[in-house]
């Protein structure tokens, strides 16, 4: 028994030594998804996840370095070793779990459609949906929720909906609205926001916080939400950090700090600063 305990203790020390001996952990982020992560006018990263990641790193025995990467290639670049963890508003989904391991979730935000004020799609408000449905969790969508989705599809039939490619939002349209709407794909949310404002999109679908950030900018003053807020299903189980499957030490270290920051209210305060509300997990 003593030998077993000694072996376990030695392995624990080896694990900590491996983490501590790493000079830095490289964090991959998009830098184009405000208020989650974004490059400001000075070319500096800012946003809820930048504050979150920096605070997390201050609690770890390592130095952290941020690396920006276009969204389409963000998981392939992780697997190729460009960085060690993704902190980039990435929802935890079963499809992504086939390639990477996720930390525990640290933030969560619903998804919603947005349109131009005065368009025919404005005003698909809760009174237009069976039972006054204003939130739809796809994990347990009953008859009323399914009816709400059906009415939304009917109202948006033939419309052009713009979304960022390789996202949960594209997955939702492909699964639930295929054939009913024309899906137009973009490399970044900034790109589809510009096209919505210019009238080249009938609607966009994105995280609520991202759309609010757009609405509060000069370019988004004529934008309004429409339809219910979606969560669950293809939208995943909150936002987490993604690591290579073999990097169990990094995963363990981040999970420990994520739990600490949740328990002491740090993550909640960060989300209130950037989203105006608590979306911590």
Each language-model region and where it sits:
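A local structural motif
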Residues: 57-68, 155-160, 175-188, 200
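Acidic, polar ligand-binding/catalytic clefts
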Residues: 54, 58, 63-153, 222-234
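Bacterial N-terminal signal peptides
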Residues: 7-15
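Periplasmic-binding protein-like
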Residues: 31, 108-112, 208-255, 277-281
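A ligand-binding cleft/hinge motif common to bilobed small-molecule-binding domains
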Residues: 72-76, 89-99, 170-177, 190, ...
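Short glycine-rich His-centered loop
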Residues: 23-48
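Short helix-initiation/N-cap motifs at beta->coil->alpha
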Residues: 50-51, 65-76, 146-149, 183-198, ...
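Extended ligand-binding regions for polar small-molecule ligands
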Residues: 51-60, 117-141, 167, 236-277
């Amino acid at each position: 028994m003593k030998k077993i305990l000694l072996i376990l203790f030695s392995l624990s020390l080896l694990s900590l030594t491996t983490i501590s001996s790493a000079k830095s952990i490289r964090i991959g982020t998009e830098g184009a998804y405000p208020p989650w992560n974004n490059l400001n006018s000075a070319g500096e990263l800012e946003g809820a996840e930048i504050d979150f990641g920096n605070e997390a790193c201050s609690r770890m025995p390592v130095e952290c370095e941020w690396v920006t990467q276009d969204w389409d290639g963000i998981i392939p670049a992780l697997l190729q070793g460009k960085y060690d963890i993704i902190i980039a508003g990435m929802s935890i989904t079963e499809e992504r779990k086939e390639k990477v391991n996720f930390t525990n979730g640290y933030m969560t935000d619903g998804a919603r459609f947005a349109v131009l004020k005065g368009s025919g799609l404005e005003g698909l408000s809760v009174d237009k949906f069976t039972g006054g449905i204003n939130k739809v969790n796809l994990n347990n969508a009953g008859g009323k929720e399914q009816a709400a989705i059906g009415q939304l599809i009917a109202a948006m039939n033939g419309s052009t909906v713009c979304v960022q490619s390789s996202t949960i939002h594209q997955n939702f349209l492909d699964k639930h609205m295929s054939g009913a709407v024309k899906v137009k794909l973009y490399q970044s949310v900034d790109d589809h926001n510009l096209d919505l404002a210019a009238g080249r999109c009938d609607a966009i679908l994105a995280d609520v916080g991202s759309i609010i950030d757009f609405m509060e900018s000069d370019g988004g003053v004529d934008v309004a939400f429409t339809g219910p807020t979606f969560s669950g299903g293809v939208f995943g189980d909150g936002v987490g950090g993604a690591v290579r499957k073999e990097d169990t030490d990094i995963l363990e270290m981040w999970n420990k700090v994520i739990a600490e920051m949740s328990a002491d209210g740090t993550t909640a305060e960060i989300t209130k600063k950037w989203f105006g509300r608590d979306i911590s997990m």
